[in-house]
């Protein structure tokens, strides 16, 4: 959508909607009208006199797009699934509504975005025990990563359904960004939106005073306050497209830990050196981290690292497993009740990890 100053006054392309449901916002209205063509501008501007419905304005990108809307009007009503909108065509009223509309819209567009608490998008979970094609991208730092855990940031590739979902989100964000003011301070460690081109915006996390991370593309860019604004709630529900991952079954030599950054750079180029696509398989979870096996053809990264002598590798099939009864888990997880399961601190710690793992797997199944 273009800004109201250039698009809203397009002759014969505007509509006034008089009975927008109270639960609707700009995007509900946008979704209705985009079915007929390109929407230049749309806004829910306030309640009607009786307070039961809202008023709104829509301007299409061209007269041809507006004519498509007109073809679908039935006696001034736009009828859809579970709604009927009363639409006044500006073409038929000689523009008498435009001064009122422009004042309301201009006031809203020039108003600063509402202040809310800092936003932090959730990391993307990988499907359990499923072979997926991935790319190792720029590392996204996380406070949940232990100093001795080698972590990577992965981006799923060749996944048409996921690409379609995120492409749709970015299309909506690009339309929204044409009508909101930028220049908003992002706190370090939190997420917002960055304009990387005149008609293109991206979700970002501020990772330092000077750097931003594109959380759906896996790239680090420079921070520019004048190109940032707060992340609207409608775009907060989707997790980052990148996934925080750790290599499963590795115990690192203390002398290798300071070299993690260098090792990550080598792993990023691993697929190119092997002339093949990297594949990952999540075999478990450690808190918010996907624990994975990473391989390229018949070459397994953990094996290669072990042969370099920088770590020890124990495949998951050989790792110790602990089993607990359903009753014990329920008793331990019951609010306000501590189960007497063991005096061994390591066993208790392991049980807590298992509970976290179960919760994460349930979350994955819901997706």
UniProtKB/Swiss-Prot annotation:
Domain RRM residues, every copy: 13-92
Compartments in which it is found: Cytoplasm; Cytoplasm, Perinuclear region; Nucleus
Disulfide bonding pattern of the chain: none
Region (Required for ife-3 interaction), start-end ranges: 298-345
Cited PROSITE patterns: RRM (PS50102)
Single GO BP term: positive regulation of chromosome segregation
The keyword Nucleotidyltransferase is assigned to this record: no
Major subcellular location class: cytoplasm
Tissue expr: Expression is restricted to the germline (at protein level).
Mutant phenotype after disruption: Worms whose mothers are lacking mel-47 exhibit prolonged interphase between the two and four cell stages of development. Mutants arrest as early embryos ranging from 50 to 80 cells with no signs of morphogenesis. Chromatin bridges which connect nuclei remain present after cytokinesis appears complete. RNAi-mediated knockdown results in maternal effect lethal (Mel phenotype). RNAi-mediated knockdown results in chromosome segregation and cell division defects in early embryos. RNAi-mediated knockdown results in defective activity of the PIWI-interacting RNA (piRNA) silencing pathway.
Record's keyword terms, sorted: Cell cycle, Cell division, Chromosome partition, Cytoplasm, Developmental protein, Nucleus, RNA-binding, RNA-mediated gene silencing
Annotated GO MF terms: RNA binding
Keyword RNA-binding appears in the UniProt entry: yes
Superkingdom as given in the UniProt entry: Eukaryota
Pfam families from the UniProt entry: RRM_1 (PF00076)
GO cellular component terms, semicolon-separated: cytoplasm; nucleus; perinuclear region of cytoplasm; RNA cap binding complex
Function, in words: Component of the pid-1 and tost-1 variants of the PETISCO complexes, which have roles in the biogenesis of a class of 21 nucleotide PIWI-interacting RNAs (piRNAs) that possess a uracil residue at the 5'-end (also called 21U-RNAs) and embryogenesis, respectively. Promotes the biogenesis of 21U-RNAs. Mediates the interaction between the PETISCO complex and the PUCH complex, the endoribonuclease complex processing the 5'-end of precursor piRNAs, thereby enhancing mature piRNA production. Required for chromosome segregation and cell division in early embryos. May have a role in DNA replication.
Subunit details: Component of the pid-1 variant of the PETISCO complex (also called the pid-3, erh-2, tofu-6, and ife-3 small RNA complex) containing at least pid-1, tofu-6, ife-3, pid-3, and erh-2, which is required for the biogenesis of 21 nucleotide PIWI-interacting RNAs (piRNAs) that possess a uracil residue at the 5'-end (also called 21U-RNAs). Within the pid-1 variant of the PETISCO complex interacts with pid-1.
This protein's name: Embryonic developmental protein tofu-6
Organism in which the protein naturally occurs: Caenorhabditis elegans
Upper taxonomic lineage: Eukaryota, Metazoa, Ecdysozoa, Nematoda, Chromadorea
Gene transcribed to yield this protein: tofu-6
